[in-house]
Amino acid sequence: MAITDYCECRFTAGNGGNGIIAWKREAHYDKGGPGGGNGGNGGNVILQADHNCDSLFFLKNKKHLFAEDGQNGKPDLAHGKNGSDLLIKVPIGTTVKNLENNSVLVDFVHDKQSFILCFGGKGGKGNAAFKSPIMRAPNLYENGDKGEILNVSLEVKYLANVGIVGFPNSGKSTLISKLSNAKPKIANYRFTTLIPVLGVVKYQNNSLVFADIPGLIENASEGSGLGHDFLRHIERCEILIHLISLDPVDNDDPCKAYLQIMDELSKYSPLLVKKKMLVVANKIDVNEGEKRFKKLEKFLQKKSISVLKISALKKELGNLLDRVFELYNKTISQFGANKFSLPMELEKHYVFQNTNENNNDPLNIEKDSLNRWIVNCKRLRYWFDKIPQTTLDNIRRLGNKIKEIGIEDQLKSVGAKKGDIIFFDGCEFVIND
């Protein structure tokens, strides 16, 4: 079965519930005052890394997921219930990007690491919340805010210290099965391994995670064969084992095989060929194995590259583990282990800017072919949605918000006069003064 390590989804947080207008009705107290409760907050969309999750298969066919809306307010000062959060569990190693600008939102590298992807809308106020010594019987209430909507991509990149790369049938699965308790499918034909296989290799009181990456073919960097599906998984590895088969059945020339794999890695990402790498010649026990090894060794010596010879099948690994752990320790002491963490400013999720505090929102006024003034303003859009125009008190409040935004002054500055028509959100208004 093919692994699902990439998907695109649309997530929508819950909308806030609406506040209501209600009045207390108590015996012997006919003027009980306002009693409309606030709406509940909408549920958030939360992503959480889980070590028991190893695929994005459960999201593959779910293109749009929703958190629960908050409930509307109720009479007798009863507030609406908050909407339930939508919790999505993802594999450790998942990177989440905003599809709109391709920016990284979060990189999950720890078990139980959580991230609020979309914030739920705040519940609207009921009329009880507007009561004051000046306004004892307010006919004011609010709609709840809309929940955030985000289109994202989720991509799993496995967290392994050592990646094993090479052509199909080079012996990668056999090698990881001999080094660890991993049980990959092994057979004498190409593309036996169809998904990355991870194995923990313990050696001299130390341990590293090895990843057997499905075999690459020519033009893998352009998507041929399994292509990009698995090249991404070695991006996180500190070091690579480049495994080359010495069996004439697997390739015509081990030197050419080396160059082809290096070329594919370079095309996919120049950073891959800059990683610390061990070149290992496998199947030294086959006919002409020694002869082909000497040819490869001589070829690589010209590039100042050493090569180890092993037989993974017979578990004749020589000093392979010595070299791997030595190179790994040297690498992390020089550069530090991969933390895969984001800069601090990216760890802090942006705040939903659908609020009246967004004072720097630009106000755009243009004249259309019908001689109407077309107004575009996010803050005005927010308050039109927030304040229902169903009571005189609400209409007055909306008028005050329009003045605060400065729309009247802006219209006058561009030449608008009494009797002109203002068009906003499908509605027409007439300037009276």
From Swiss-Prot:
Gene3D superfamilies named in the record: GTP-binding protein OBG, C-terminal domain (3.30.300.350), GTP1/OBG domain (2.70.210.12), P-loop containing nucleotide triphosphate hydrolases (3.40.50.300)
A Pfam family that the UniProt record links to this protein: DUF1967
Keywords assigned by UniProt, alphabetized: Cytoplasm, GTP-binding, Hydrolase, Magnesium, Metal-binding, Nucleotide-binding
Cofactor(s) of this protein: Mg(2+)
Annotated positions binding GTP: 166-173, 191-195, 212-215, 282-285, 310-312
EC class (word): hydrolase
UniProt GO molecular function: GTP binding; GTPase activity; magnesium ion binding
Residues that, per the record, bind Mg(2+): S173, T193
Family: Belongs to the TRAFAC class OBG-HflX-like GTPase superfamily. OBG GTPase family.
NCBIfam families from the UniProt entry: Obg_CgtA, Obg_CgtA_exten, PRK12297.1, PRK12299.1, small_GTP
Function statement: An essential GTPase which binds GTP, GDP and possibly (p)ppGpp with moderate affinity, with high nucleotide exchange rates and a fairly low GTP hydrolysis rate. Plays a role in control of the cell cycle, stress response, ribosome biogenesis and in those bacteria that undergo differentiation, in morphogenesis control.
Name of the molecule in the record: GTPase Obg
Native source organism of the sequence: Mycoplasma genitalium (strain ATCC 33530 / DSM 19775 / NCTC 10195 / G37)
